[in-house]
């Protein structure tokens, strides 16, 4: 791992889960990171810390995995906000009325949205990436 990225290992109820965060982020009052796939409850082939509803995993497993992450952050799962990413250009500001969009299912996520941002505290923003 290079010096510009730090890895954080967190002991969770289903094993250790990890995320990487850029080292410069420590200068700001935010938490940012990319999670690894271990330490969650999803079964193969999604094992185990799958955070996405749209890939065919059991919805309850995704909810539990998301709860593992936000518990570490000290935030309620119902504040998770995300969009249905479509490889487009649309970015959406998460305002109070959008907090919780996509928290518990793909059907409530913001449509046709590839980026989200906010200035609200305690609102975890989820984006999904793949190794394709």
Locations of the language-model features?
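Active-site microenvironment for binding and transforming phosphate-containing groups
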Residues: 1-132
């Amino acid at each position: 791992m290079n010096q510009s990225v730090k890895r954080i290992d967190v002991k969770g109820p289903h094993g250790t889960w990890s995320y990487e965060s850029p080292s410069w982020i420590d200068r700001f009052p935010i938490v940012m990171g990319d999670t690894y796939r271990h330490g969650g409850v999803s079964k193969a082939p999604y094992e185990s810390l799958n955070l996405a509803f749209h890939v065919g995993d059991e919805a309850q497993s995704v909810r539990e995995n998301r709860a593992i992450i936000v518990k570490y952050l000290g935030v309620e799962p119902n504040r998770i906000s995300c969009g249905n990413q479509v490889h487009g250009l649309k970015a959406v500001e998460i305002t109070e009325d959008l907090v919780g969009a996509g928290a518990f299912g793909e059907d409530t996520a913001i449509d046709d949205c590839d980026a989200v941002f906010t200035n609200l505290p305690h609102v975890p923003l989820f984006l999904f990436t793949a190794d394709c």
